[in-house]
């Protein structure tokens, strides 16, 4: 691979993920983004899917430089963003791109996603950020095609900026580029939860459990991320950090507290 510290413009892009530094998605993404500028990769040293916005506070972190501009951190995606911005990068990045995730990050599931959380952390630090996911769990998905989409979105962000308190959640169908439908700006969808705990017994008679054994069923509503992706559109959802339910403020203000 090309050394990631070299690029063709003065833009500096930081890349991270939650699937780990050796995942094919992050390798395809980092290579593709080189056409926009200098790329530094700071990613977990192993799988950290569903880590959410967790931050390591009660243990030391270790960093391993695998090659120039390519760092593995024994922490979460949020740890990686902090380490990159505050310690490893020589300059403050112009953009943080998290991905390419193995599997979509849609609807309510973004609250679990380490991929989305990394972009959220960058947004908290005032840095434009994009989370990118491919709708496949296979290692041989169309990551190169997804990386091309990520570059197009990143170029728009670097050129035009983003509205205040906004980062992007991009979900890409797993198909060749010529089979993708035009990108759509979408809203976050919802799903019907089918939460299930599977309990088993090991050979020594002790119980163990698996969480989340069934695929989620998303509500296929027009305008949502799921609806777009299900029809092979690239879904681009603008997200922000304010979780306040403003309509509920009016209702709760009438409580006799």
Language-model features: where?
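Electrostatically charged, flexible surface regions
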Residues: 144-257
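Short, Lys/Arg-enriched N-terminal segments with co-localized hydrophobic residues
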Residues: 1-10
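Glycine/threonine-rich flexible loop motifs
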Residues: 104-113
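Alpha-helix C-terminal capping segments
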Residues: 84-90, 117-128
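Short beta-strand segments
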Residues: 16, 42-44, 74, 98-101, ...
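Short, Asp-centered acidic motifs that coordinate Mg2+ and/or phosphate
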Residues: 95
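Glycine-rich phosphate/pyrophosphate-binding loops
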Residues: 123-145
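A cross-family phosphate/adenosyl-ligand binding-site feature
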Residues: 13, 24-87, 91-92
């Amino acid at each position: 691979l090309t050394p990631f510290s070299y690029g063709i413009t003065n833009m500096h892009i930081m890349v991270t993920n939650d699937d780990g530094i050796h995942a094919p998605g992050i390798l395809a993404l980092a290579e593709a983004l080189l056409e926009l500028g200098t790329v530094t990769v700071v990613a977990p040293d192993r799988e950290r899917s569903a880590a959410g916005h967790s931050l390591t506070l009660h243990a030391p972190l270790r960093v391993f430089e695998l090659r120039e501009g390519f760092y593995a951190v024994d922490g979460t995606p949020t740890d990686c963003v902090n380490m990159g911005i505050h310690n490893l990068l020589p300059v403050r990045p112009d953009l943080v791109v998290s991905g390419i995730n193995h599997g979509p990050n849609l609807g309510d599931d973004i609250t679990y996603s380490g991929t989305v959380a990394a972009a959220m952390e960058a947004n908290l630090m005032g840095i434009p950020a994009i989370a990118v996911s491919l709708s496949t769990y296979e290692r041989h998905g169309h990551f190169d095609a997804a990386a091309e989409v990520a570059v197009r979105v990143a170029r728009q962000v670097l050129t035009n900026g983003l509205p205040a308190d906004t980062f992007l959640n991009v979900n890409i169908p797993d198909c060749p580029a010529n089979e993708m439908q035009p990108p759509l700006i979408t809203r976050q969808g919802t799903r019907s939860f089918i939460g299930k705990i599977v309990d088993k017994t090991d050979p020594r008679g002790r119980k163990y459990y698996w969480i989340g054994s069934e695929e989620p069923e998303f509500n296929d509503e027009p305008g949502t991320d799921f609806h777009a992706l299900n029809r092979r559109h690239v879904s681009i959802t603008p997200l922000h950090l304010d979780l306040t339910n403003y309509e509920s403020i009016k209702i709760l203000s009438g409580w006799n507290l």
